[in-house]
Amino acid sequence: MEFVPCRKCNNGWLYKMTDDGMVAVECECHKKWDHENTVEKTYKHNGFDIRHYNYNPRTYAGTKSVKDKDRIINYVEQFDKNPAVRSLVCYLYGPNGTQKTTMMSWVGHQLLDKGYSVRYMLMNDLVKLLMDAEDFNQEKAEKAKAMVEKLEETDLIIIDEAFDKEKMKLYRSGYQLSYIDSWIRRRVGALNKGIFFVSNVEIKNIEANGLSHSIQDFVEREVVLHNCYLQFLDNYMQSTVKEFDGSLF
């Protein structure tokens, strides 16, 4: 992000004469640029797709899920006003192409801008990380454990492609399920920190997608308890293709 100074300063600095001589004071335009630059770098580092960085919910395409879109906007507004919101387990369901990931990337951007720590990751990557933390290879395990500890300190974790057997590598033995179950319960119960699941799988079908009844029961109970089940049902791709009558080649 290139810095463009305002008309008042000299490349981001204001020079004032004091009793001790000339003093350089950082201009507000440079402070703003520095903050935005830091947020953008953190956004990319924390797993978000930079293509969604400047997304604006006002450009949301569709009419079926406007109410839930507005609820997500309110979630962001309440995040720093109401501590209870920071510990919620939320679930955003919708078929492919319904702008779920794009909207949640906006959530990440807004909360990072407010000074909170937010991480975006796929559930398959989370499972792999939890398994690596128990690996016999000490170096590999220690590296994974350090990352797991960072996740514990993170204010909000957005988990995409959640509970989708087509997007997760689950062994027939199902031994990974205990890792997922324990991690979710610890984050919600012991750490009292929030999770925002994003999924193509309806919450009532988690078990049918190869996960355990225990996981579905816990997640469903936490989500329903606080009325945090949201749906995006407007297929952005279908509406775009329908409206687009030209060709680029």
Residue ranges of each PLM-predicted region?
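Short, catalytically relevant binding-site loops at active-site mouths
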Residues: 96-102, 125-128, 164-165
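Walker A/P-loop nucleotide-binding motif
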Residues: 85-104
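Short glycine-rich substrate-engagement loop in P-loop NTPases that contacts/grips substrate
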Residues: 67-73, 95, 109-153, 170
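A short, basic N-terminal segment
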Residues: 1-74, 238-249
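Loop/turn-to-beta-strand initiation segments
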Residues: 116-117, 153-157, 190-197
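Pre-Walker A (pre-P-loop) alpha-helix and adjacent loop at the N terminus of AAA/AAA+ ATPase modules
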Residues: 59-90, 109
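Conserved RecA-like P-loop NTPase ATPase core
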Residues: 9, 60, 104, 122, ...
